[in-house]
């Protein structure tokens, strides 16, 4: 599997992941900036985003507590959801390349995803606002990508696609043509197909869960029924033996 870097554009700046740490199960998920100890204001929303039954991260990773460190703040909105989901899944397989506080694009980053979108519990992607602003804010990052000969895939909803195309087709941005591409998606799962990440990562997890559940039901059924059958068999055998003794007059008479 190829390694990937995920970038989250906001109306203020472009944010990268500097670390994702697995925490103890009883600890609430939080978001911080560059290993600081103060959680960001969106940590409560992130908790709902991660933890079952409302969240989607625990559903696919079976893990419920993380600490995310970002290169800079995200203080509001929900358009971070798509990028966070993609980053979590890629990181779960050990293929997320982290940014640094003052350097979002490193020399060892060959596959970069720029993600902005809102997702629901079925991973369906909804449109978000301020795409044009986010693209303009991202121009310095796009220029860094060109300097380092890196390519960026912009991932957005179907409804936000035209805004991105308009930006890329602007004569002022023609130099991005060979380095930055855009693809729209209706569901976050489609992104993993596009980037050629294992296509069955979601299907296999669901299949394994159902298979494990069926095995548990089978074991419970056997644990209940085997003792019952054994008792019935033993009782029937004793009854038949007693009848044979009576029929053969082999019982003791006093």
Region annotations inferred by a language model:
Residues 1-251:
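Peripheral, non-AAA+ core regions of ATP-driven protein-machinery
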